[in-house]
Amino acid sequence: MLSAVAKPRQLASQILNFGLILSTAFMIWKGLSVVSDSSSPIVVVLSGSMEPAFQRGDLLFLWNRNLLQETDVGEIVVYNVRGKDIPIVHRIVRKFGTGPHAKLLTKGDNNAGDDTDLYAQGQDYLERKDIVGSVVGYVPFVGYVTILLTEHPWLKKVMLGLMGVLVVLQRE
């Protein structure tokens, strides 16, 4: 009789713990977004265009609070192209003008040409508002899990299945 009461309580406890983990992760993400002033304070390098500086799968930490200084040539930035939601990590190679309306031209370290072909149609340069953040640190290869899960959707299902089995089999 006692075990029949304990099982729903154990299930409720596991559900609440799972909700706590999700809400904590969300709060940490939003906190980092506010502190760094970036919609994406952490990004994963998706291609080899920035080698040797960054490898595919590196986890980058961004900072977008350049209140007292401008974005400079040589700075590695992450930007989004209008109409696409894939962040691009490249270095600023040219700058025209100063202030918030300065025109910026970017290029991947491992690319032959600049990024004008990557920009939105009719856009020849980036402006400061297009920049998601400047790279201030990184952890090598940690983001490779994200790449694997994106490139192999079946892997997501396997991982979710394994986590489900672990939750069911877990005993306190």
Swiss-Prot record:
Entry keywords, A to Z: Endoplasmic reticulum, Hydrolase, Membrane, Protease, Signal-anchor, Transmembrane, Transmembrane helix
Keyword Cell membrane in record: no
Residues at the active site: 49 (charge relay system), 90 (charge relay system), 115 (charge relay system)
Residue ranges that the UniProt entry lists as topological domain Lumenal: 36-172
EC code(s) of this entry: 3.4.21.89
Species the sequence originates in: Grosmannia clavigera (strain kw1407 / UAMH 11150)
Gene: SEC11
PROSITE patterns with a match to the protein in the record: SPASE_I_1
Family annotation (CDD domains): S26_SPase_I
GO molecular function per UniProt: serine-type endopeptidase activity
Topology versus the membrane: Single-pass type II membrane protein
Name of the protein described by the UniProt record: Signal peptidase complex catalytic subunit SEC11
Region feature (C-terminal short (CTS) helix): 158-169
